[in-house]
């Protein structure tokens, strides 16, 4: 589940 670490990260850079 990488969505949990993208909380603050905008799409694109959130890998």
From Swiss-Prot:
Return the GO cellular component terms, semicolon-separated. mitochondrial inner membrane
Q: Would you say which domain of life the source belongs to?
A: Eukaryota
Topology with respect to the bilayer = Peripheral membrane protein
Question: What EC number(s) has UniProt assigned to this enzyme?
Answer: 7.1.1.2
Give the enzyme class. translocase
Q: Which reactions fall under this protein's catalytic activity?
A: a ubiquinone + NADH + 5 H(+)(in) = a ubiquinol + NAD(+) + 4 H(+)(out)
Where is the protein localized? Answer: Mitochondrion inner membrane
Its keywords, alphabetically, are:
Membrane, Mitochondrion, Mitochondrion inner membrane, NAD, Oxidoreductase, Translocase, Ubiquinone
GO MF, one annotated term:
NADH dehydrogenase (ubiquinone) activity
Whom does it interact with, and what assembly results? Answer: Complex I is composed of about 45 different subunits.
Primary role: Transfer of electrons from NADH to the respiratory chain. The immediate electron acceptor for the enzyme is believed to be ubiquinone.
Q: What is this protein called?
A: NADH-ubiquinone oxidoreductase 12 kDa subunit
